[in-house]
Structures are given as structure tokens and as C-alpha cells.
């Protein structure tokens, strides 16, 4: 901790800027508010899979690089999350077996967070690829 944050406790939040990429002014206001609240760390990427991989095998990390750079400039540390909290639409359409199965034997519908089958080999492989 001494080398990373000068011995200070982490004071932060989950941050999901991928929701506002078309509105850079929202990020700038968020950054201003984070600084005003003395935020020194954020978790990024928890629900960003559909933006990081909009199509199977097609990746876009440019926005994430840009956000990380701006946070770094503002002396805000970044904790990268595994972006499996929300699956992209293409994944559930192509591989419906990644969806959780309820007690009545029916699969959950897509659109919820943390809604994947933890034992699905396909899901595990797709998370590793990402």
C-alpha cells in the first residue's frame, strides 16, 4: 500500500463509463465529482463486456485505454474487473446454454446481470478469451 497510494486507504467506487461513451461531458463531470469526493480508486469494467467485445472475437479497448489514462492523470487508481457481470446479446443468442437454468428446468432470459451458468464450459472459455 505504501508504494501504490502513499499509505492511504482506498476510497472509491464501481464506475461504469461505458454507458456514457457518446457523452464525454458526463465523464468529465463524473471525474470532477470524484475529485471533490476525494475518490482515489475506481473499479472499471464490471458490466462492460458488450462494449469490449461488441461482436464475437471483435474487441474494442480504445475507450477503456482513454478512460484509464484520464483517471491516471487525475491520480485515481484503477482496479480492472472481469467484465462477465453482464453478457453481450450475441453470446446468449449464439450460445443459449450459457444462461442459468431455474429449478423448474427453464433457462433464464437474457438481460439480467450475473445471469450466466457458472458451470458452462462455453461461458468459462468466453470469459478466458476476454
Task: Enumerate the predicted regions with their spans.
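Active-site-adjacent "subsite" loops/lids of carbohydrate-active enzymes
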Residues: 85-130
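Boundary/entry segment of secreted carbohydrate-active catalytic domains
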Residues: 1-23
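Aromatic-lined substrate-binding rim segments of carbohydrate-active enzymes
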Residues: 27-104
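Alpha-helix N-cap and loop-to-helix initiation/capping positions
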Residues: 22, 58-63, 118, 122, ...
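Short amphipathic alpha-helical segments, especially helix-boundary/capping motifs
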Residues: 4-8, 41-45, 105-111
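Short, contiguous strand/loop micro-motifs
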Residues: 16-18, 53-55, 117-118
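Short, acidic/polar
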Residues: 20-36, 127-130
Amino acid at each position: 500500500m505504501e508504494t501504490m497510494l502513499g499509505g492511504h486507504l482506498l476510497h472509491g467506487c464501481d464506475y461504469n463509463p461505458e454507458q456514457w461513451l457518446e457523452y464525454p461531458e458526463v465523464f468529465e463531470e463524473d471525474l470532477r465529482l470524484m475529485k471533490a469526493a476525494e475518490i482515489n480508486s475506481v473499479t472499471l469494467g464490471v458490466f462492460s463486456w458488450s462494449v469490449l467485445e461488441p461482436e464475437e472475437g471483435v474487441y474494442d479497448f480504445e475507450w477503456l485505454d482513454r478512460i484509464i489514462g484520464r483517471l491516471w492523470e487525475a491520480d485515481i487508481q484503477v482496479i480492472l474487473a472481469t467484465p462477465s457481470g453482464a453478457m453481450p446479446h450475441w453470446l446468449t443468442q449464439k450460445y443459449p446454454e450459457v444462461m442459468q437454468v431455474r429449478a423448474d428446468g427453464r433457462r433464464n432470459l437474457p438481460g439480467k446481470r450475473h445471469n450466466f451458468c457458472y458451470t458452462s464450459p462455453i461461458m468459462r472459455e468466453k470469459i478466458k478469451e476476454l
